[in-house]
Every structure is written in structure tokens, then in C-alpha cells.
Regions:
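Ribonuclease/tRNase effector modules and their secretory precursors
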Residues: 1-275
Length: 275
């Protein structure tokens, strides 16, 4: 099967999985509200009409942590006897498909272990599952180089090649320790945006819309409020991430401000272009 044929099948499959997951969501929400023992690990498998098995995984450290996150959906497959994974990230117009190569997961384990971040107590044998249990905010970003892709997640940045307008091949991973100042600035702002959306979800029990984001008060962008929220949430992955980000900003404040202003101008220009 070619990559083009594979992506076509995955998109058809994902539509089926999405419909079935949406039908199950009310039951999952009741399970989440009743759950009393934490940390809580939950997983399920969805077998599609094409006989493909998709994984749905979820890990929450505390009750308040559980209120902030939804399960991750992905599928693994083995071209040429090497483990790959596929997952979708919602975009402005349609979902973007990421195909993660075995090389990406090799680099992920190598660099994550090097940083000694093992907040879940021990490494999960299945590295693909471990990645999706740790990373709930997986975001795609506009291309910097023609034919390239970039994504951000709690554990760092991933890079690769653009296969088509809505499909990318993920090849490698950079941990927070390896990021340059411009990369860390983009990462910092993406993760702080993640805190804002998690705060909203924990209070309102649904994902924030663009209209709701535009109406948020200044309180949602206060470092002090973020710190209080993370303290009560008690997710060690986010606690360490937050400390690392604030340390970075303190050590590179002038560069951070310049790059942040540049990103804001670029974002404004893109919004104007869409109007």
C-alpha cells in the first residue's frame, strides 16, 4: 500500500471512529465523574469495518486533572516491520493527519529519557501509547520552510515533511532542552494557551470555542492564576513544564519579547488575510 492509499484509508477509518467515539462520549463523561481512584488509566480499542484497530487512551493524575483532558485517538501499523503511528489534529478548515515514523519514536525515547522526565513512575512498554498518554495538547503549526511540517506537544516539538496539504510525515523530535530561543518562545506561548484552554474546560466542562476565547477576562492570562490552577490540578508533567517555561522566559526575556511580538504580528496578518 502506498502512502497515498494509506492516508485515504486512514481518513475513511477515522470518520467511522469519530462517529463511534462521539456516541460513546456521554458514557465516558459519566465514568470520569464517578471515578474516585487516581491516577486513572483507561483505554479502549475500536475495530473498524476495514478491520483496523484504533486505540483510545487516557491518563489522569487527579480528579481536577481529569476535568481538563480528553482521551487521545491513534492507530499503529508496521510498514517494513517498523512501528509507525497515525493521528489527527483539528485544524482551521479540516483535520491534519500526522504519520509518525519509527525514527520519530526512537528519538522521542532517547531524548525524553535523557531529560529524566518520567512523571508517570515508570516507562510504559509501548512507547507509542506512552507518547499519547503524556501529550494532550498536540498542535500543528504553519510551515516555515516549503515542504516541511512542525508540531508542538507538552514534551517538545516534532518535525517532518509535508506529503500533501493536509498530511505530514513526522520524522524527528526535539525535547525542551534542545530548543533554540525562537522555538522555545513559540513552544512557551503554545503551552500557555494550553493552560488557558484547560482552565476553561475544567470550569465549563466543554472545549473552548473561538468566540468564548475572545471574551475571556484578563484573569485567564495571569501567571499567578496559572500557578494556582496548576497547583490544584497537580499534574507533574505540567508542573515541570510550567517551571521550565518561566525559567526560560526569565533567562531570555529581551529575546522572548522581540520574538513574541513578531509572532503576534504574523498572526494578525494571517487573520487579516482570512477576512
Amino acid at each position: 500500500m502506498t502512502l497515498s492509499e494509506l492516508t485515504t484509508e486512514l481518513r475513511k477509518d477515522y470518520r467511522e471512529v469519530s462517529v463511534r467515539w462521539k456516541a460513546f462520549m456521554p458514557k465516558f463523561e459519566r465514568m470520569r465523574k464517578r471515578q474516585a481512584m487516581f491516577p486513572w488509566f483507561w483505554e479502549a480499542t475500536v475495530k473498524t469495518k476495514r478491520n483496523n484497530s484504533w486505540s483510545i487512551v487516557y491518563y489522569a493524575f487527579t480528579k481536577k486533572d481529569a476535568a481538563c483532558i480528553w482521551p487521545q485517538i491513534y492507530i499503529t501499523f508496521r510498514p517494513e516491520n517498523a512501528t509507525w503511528a497515525a493521528f489527527f489534529v483539528d485544524g482551521e478548515d479540516k483535520s491534519f493527519l500526522f504519520l509518525s515514523t519509527s525514527h520519530f519514536f526512537e528519538r522521542y525515547v532517547e531524548r525524553l529519557l535523557k531529560s529524566s522526565r518520567q512523571e508517570m513512575g515508570c516507562m510504559v512498554n509501548d512507547v507509542v501509547k506512552y507518547f499519547f498518554l503524556r501529550n494532550h495538547h498536540i498542535m500543528s503549526r504553519k510551515l516555515e520552510l516549503e515542504g516541511s511540517i512542525k508540531g508542538l506537544c507538552e514534551d517538545g516539538i516534532f518535525l517532518g515533511d509535508l506529503l500533501s496539504g493536509d498530511t505530514g510525515l513526522v520524522k524527528t523530535y526535539l525535547s525542551r532542552d534542545e530548543l533554540k530561543v525562537n522555538q522555545y518562545t513559540e513552544y512557551f506561548e503554545a503551552m500557555m494557551s494550553g493552560i488557558v484552554s484547560d482552565m476553561f474546560m475544567s470550569r465549563n466542562r466543554h472545549t473552548m470555542t473561538d468566540e468564548e476565547e475572545a471574551e475571556l477576562s484578563d484573569e485567564h492570562y495571569s501567571t499567578f492564576v496559572w500557578r494556582e490552577f496548576l497547583f490544584s490540578r497537580n499534574n507533574p508533567i505540567w508542573n515541570e513544564l510550567f517551571v521550565d517555561c518561566l525559567t526560560f522566559r526569565k533567562e531570555h526575556l529581551e529575546e522572548y519579547r522581540k520574538i513574541s511580538d513578531m509572532f503576534e504580528i504574523i498572526a494578525d496578518n494571517r487573520r487579516d488575510a482570512r477576512c
